[in-house]
From Swiss-Prot:
Phosphocholine binds at residues 54, 87, 105, 107, 133, 137-138. Residues 11-30 are annotated as: N-terminal region. Belongs to the actinoporin family. Sea anemone subfamily. Its main location: secreted. This is DELTA-stichotoxin-Hcr4b. Octamer or nonamer in membranes. Monomer in the soluble state. The record marks 113 as: Important in the initial contact with the lipid membrane. It comes from Radianthus crispa (Leathery sea anemone). It holds the Pfam family Anemone_cytotox. It is found in: Secreted; Nematocyst; Target cell membrane.
């Protein structure tokens, strides 16, 4: 069965093959991204919202992500001859009472910018907005450099992730205990 952005899949099956299919669904658009976030946190997540600083999406965030499942999501630049990238943050309320925030940036102009991404856990319930995006983008984000990165997120959780450097980017993240 084909993977579709806006759905969930078995966490163990998340990988570049599935995310490449998500990219393919976006069609012939440059500046696009397929995102997969594997929930190995021991709890469940409920979608709050996505905030696009630039670009848009054609799908909604999967509403509920149980433990050991992975959410699939995507973003793209606006259609037409516009100089935009796919730049956003999205948020999930976690069953531990905190919020998982994810930020990605696939810029239009690679002469000035690079692919960037980050993950952060916020205390309590918090929707994604410009402030959340800026907190992660201007904090200490990871470059989309085709390399794996990991960090302790606090609250007993850690993350490991990778983002490609391409204009058709893939971002794969695993949240675990």
């Amino acid at each position: 069965s084909a993977a579709l952005a806006g759905t969930i899949t078995l966490g163990a099956s998340l990988g570049f093959q599935i995310l490449d299919k998500v990219l393919g669904e976006l069609g012939k658009v440059s500046r696009k991204i397929a995102v997969g976030v594997d929930n190995e946190s021991g709890g469940s997540w409920t979608a709050l919202n996505a905030y696009f600083r630039s670009g848009t999406t054609d799908v909604i965030l999967p509403e509920f992500v149980p433990n050991q499942k992975a959410l699939l999501y995507s973003g793209r630049k606006d259609t037409g001859p516009v100089a935009t990238g796919a730049v956003a943050a999205f948020a999930y309320y976690m069953s531990n009472g905190h919020t998982l925030g994810v930020m990605f940036s696939v810029p239009f102009d690679y002469n000035l910018y690079s692919n960037w991404w980050d993950v952060k856990i916020y205390s309590g319930k918090r929707r994604a907005d410009q402030a959340m995006y800026e907190d992660m983008y201007y904090g200490n984000p990871y470059r989309g450099d085709n390399g794996w990165h990991q960090k302790n997120l606090g609250y007993g959780l850690k993350m490991k992730g990778i983002m490609t450097s391409a204009v058709e980017a893939i971002l794969e993240i695993r949240i675990s205990r």
